[in-house]
Amino acid sequence: EKETGTNLKWVATGTGKALKMGENCDVDVLLVHAPAAEKKLVESGFGIDRKEVVYNDFIIVGPIADPAHVSGKGTVEALKIIKDSKANFLSRGDDSGTHKKELSLWKDASQVIPETDLWYIQTGQGMLTTINMAAEKNGYTMTDRGTWIKYEAQKGADNKMKIVVEKDKTLFKQYSVIPVNKAKCPNVKLELAQSFSDWLIKPETQKFIGDFKLLDKTLFTPNASK
């Protein structure tokens, strides 16, 4: 706002709901992380000029005791072990980008999404709530690293969870900005949406994002120029 004079009104929601808001002409611009679904939005004509801007990664977290013994395993192997051991796994179950990614990983691991199994618990909640529920049920969940860092900051010494799977190439998480198409949604403030998109990829903005840390940990890595 200081640089452009544009006042942003954020709606924090999962990527699936965000993309639906774009199709319903309820927003001017989207910042989302489900590439396949994003490309469908652009192909449908509701999204334009998609730009990749930053990335972080997903991780699998679980109890410090790690009852399923998946620490250090690859993503697919870890999910197979969790399934075979029937350890509790908490899923957002909310059609968010994280949920979409998790489902794709279950398909890679077992060809079948374990939605009817008692150990597979769908919360229908956001990420922080889902991590908290996983801790309560001595279970595992998949989260983005940024939310995990926030969770660590909130819990401090009371944190009963730890990262068990990370830095697997299957866990990459790309964020993109997509203005909504004025031709489909006449009330869209396209100039302001485009201004925000252009601002996100500016070198100065990219540097600011890369330098921003919580608990001395980087939340997002800029990659608009890559």
Residue ranges and their predicted role:
Residues 2-7, 16, 20, 26, ...:
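Exported/periplasmic ABC-transporter solute-binding proteins
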Residues 29-55:
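Acidic, polar ligand-binding/catalytic clefts
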Residues 55-57, 86:
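Residue-level signal for tight coil/turn positions that link beta-strands
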Residues 60:
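Serine endopeptidase catalytic core focused on the charge-relay Asp
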